[in-house]
Structure formats: C-alpha cells, structure tokens
Amino acid sequence: SECLVGSEMCIRDRSEVEELKNRLFYKRENAWEDKTGEQLNNIFAYAEGYINFLNKSKTEREIVANAKEIAESNGFRCICEYETLSVGDKVYYINREKSMYLAVIGKQGMESGINIVGAHADSPRLDLKPNPLYEEGGFAYFKTHYYGGIKKYQWTTIPLSIHGVVVKANGEKIYVNVGDDEKDPVFTITDLLPHLAQEQMEKKLKEGISGEDLNPVSYTHLRAHETLANL
C-alpha cells in the first residue's frame, strides 16, 4: 500500500498513485516531437528568414534599415507622410537611424489601453576607439573597447568584419562593410599558440584574454611601418 506521510489517506492500489501523478504533476513534453510536416516546414522557413535578417543586421543602423524595408513591404509608412491619422493606419518613425517605432492606430484613445511590444537592436560587439589605428612590429592594429556582456576568449582567431558609418566634414555619409563578402579581407585578433601560452593557460578563464588584448590586425606587410607613416 502507499500511504501519504502525515495524512490518514492511504492508497492501496499503485494505479491510483499513477493516476494522481498524471493529474497533479507537471509533465514535461518535447514540443518538437508532435509537430506535423507542414508545421516543421513553417518553423524552418521562419528560422531561415530570421537567420537572413541577422546576417544582414549586425549594427543598430543595419537593423533599422532592414526593419524599415520589412515594415514597408507590410503596409507601414513613415508618419511624416500623414497630416492626420485614422483607424488602421500603420506608421513608423525612425530616430537617428538607430531606433524605430511602429504603430497600428486603434479605434479608441490611448486612455483606453495600449499594447506595447519592445525589442532591443544593440548586440555585443567591439567598437573602434576614436583614434584606433596603431602600428607594432610591422603590423597595423585597431584599438577597440567591447560593448555588452562578452566572453573575451571567444573573439580571438576568428574572422571579423567591420560595419559602420563615417560622416565626412561636409555631412556626406559613407557606409562601411568590410569582411562579410568572400572577396573581402578579414580582420582577426591574434592569440598565442598552445606551446607558447603556458602562463596564459594558468590564468582564470575570464583573465586569459583581457579587454586590452582585443585589438584586431587590420593590415600586415613587410614594410607596413612605412605605409603607416604615409597615412
């Protein structure tokens, strides 16, 4: 028999215990296993679209530009085009190319309630310092500072690209994207070979690579120091 401690209730049949367990216990189920073929296709299609968006959207400005394209393809228009708003209007407003607000105008005023969905557009990255370029040992490097919660050791010896915008004195904007195309040069942060890294490997994981070490190689040449002198 099965008896509950501190209770007068006694369950003699184990099947009763299983029945109670099935009724009262939270059951963990794999949400993937009961999906149909059509549902799986929809899941993969959605994931592919999201991956493509992420591949094209690596900075706030790129995210906003791509979000604008998606919004306009779904009937949204800049609020600057409207003198008055009507029920059902779909509008957006872009703030300095780095944040975006979208709204669908409802039937009642905001005092009756409002539904808000928020998402952030920033992500962990390395930002170039104001005067980033320096030369050491025939190599040109970029000085950086990291943004967001990063595991610094994950950023070494992998191909990196540079994304951003340069504003010239006359106000002209030049958008920069180097390293994503297969024909582009890539940037990388060097690390020590295992047989040279005994001291480094004795450190704690978070200390093995410091923030000051996250300086990508931007150029290398036998006469790099002469080239830099002419920049």
Residue ranges, per PLM feature:
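Residues forming anionic-ligand binding surfaces in small-molecule and nucleic-acid pockets
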Residues: T188-D191, H195-Y219
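A generic, well-ordered mixed alpha/beta core segment in the N-terminal half of proteins
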Residues: G113-Q198
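TRNA-binding/sensing appendages of the translation machinery
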Residues: E48-D89, I94-R96
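Flexible, glycine/proline-enriched loop segments at strand-loop-helix junctions
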Residues: K56-S57, I150-K151, D180-D181, D213-L222
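N-terminal capping segment at the start of a domain
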Residues: E19-E60
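Conserved small/polar residues in nucleotide/adenosyl-binding loops
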Residues: L4-D13, T220-T227
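Acidic/His- and Gly-rich active-site-bordering loop/insert found
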Residues: C78, Y82-L128
